[in-house]
Curated annotation (Swiss-Prot):
Membership in a protein family: Belongs to the UPF0161 family.
InterPro entries, sorted: Membr_insert_effic_factor_YidD (IPR002696)
Organism expressing this protein natively: Rhodopseudomonas palustris (strain TIE-1)
Bilayer topology: Peripheral membrane protein
Biological role: Could be involved in insertion of integral membrane proteins into the membrane.
Protein name: Putative membrane protein insertion efficiency factor
Cellular compartments annotated: Cell inner membrane
NCBIfam families: membrane protein insertion efficiency factor YidD
Keywords: Cell inner membrane, Cell membrane, Membrane
GO cellular component: plasma membrane
Main location class: membrane
Protein origin, superkingdom: Bacteria
């Protein structure tokens, strides 16, 4: 015997509203203000791409804090280069300690072709013999 549906199909879209609103604001920025001021981000991916991915992966609260930290790092005396969204949220992050979601300081990531050797022997062609 199957229980009748109580009409809870509306919950998932409602829970996605904050995430979609944050991503919508980034979309609006990318299509209005960004073309006017120019594309001059110091990082790859750009700050707006980073913010969109962080909010998509982690939601508006955690992704928003990650994006804020990235924007503060993207300044003349800040970092530059490759700065990807983390695959997982930091283990020490809690909703009531939001600053722990983000990396507030950072170092420039090395280019992929001079990355540190992993010990697998595939990087031997990078060094001259």
């Amino acid at each position: 015997m199957q229980l009748p549906s109580r009409g809870t199909d509306w919950i998932a879209p409602v829970l996605r509203l904050p995430r979609n609103a944050g991503r919508g604001l980034i979309w609006l920025y990318r299509h209005t203000l960004s073309p006017l001021v120019g594309y001059n981000c110091r990082h790859y991916p750009t700050c707006s791409m980073y913010g969109d991915e962080a909010i998509r992966k982690f939601g508006l609260w955690a992704g928003g804090w990650m994006t804020l930290a990235r924007l503060l790092r993207c300044q003349p005396w800040g970092t530059s280069g490759i700065d990807l969204v983390p695959q997982t949220a930091p283990s020490r992050a809690r909703w009531y300690l939001p600053w722990r979601y983000a990396r507030w300081r950072g170092v420039n990531a090395p280019p992929p072709d001079v990355a540190e050797p992993c010990g697998c022997g595939s990087h031997s062609q990078l060094t001259p013999h």
